[in-house]
Amino acid sequence: MPRSVKKGPIVASHLLAKIEKQKNLKNKKVIQTWSRSSTITPIFVGHKIAVYNGREHIPVYITENMVGHKLGEFSPTRTYRGHNKKDKKMQKK
């Protein structure tokens, strides 16, 4: 269920403060965060944020298309290794 418009988006205050510091800098550093539930706002566009997936920080470059989504959507937590392929013995039966 989406969040009410009158409440506004959820953004971690520490993450917002780090982005405000780097807003006018020419060389922007990667910002590490554990806040996967923060909503991407237009202020984030052009920054590179490393989002924690439970094992490592995955760097995500924020574009205009990502505004309104959550940071956690862009750092998958599970690795898909594919289904087992059937043996040739099983195919003959």
From Swiss-Prot:
GO BP: ribosomal small subunit assembly; translation
Disulfide bonds: none
Signal sequence residues: none
Keyword Iron: no
Name of the molecule in the record: Small ribosomal subunit protein uS19
GO cellular component terms attached to this protein's record: cytoplasm; small ribosomal subunit
Entry keywords, A to Z: Ribonucleoprotein, Ribosomal protein, RNA-binding, rRNA-binding
Region (Disordered): 72-93
Entry keyword Transport: no
Protein function: Protein S19 forms a complex with S13 that binds strongly to the 16S ribosomal RNA.
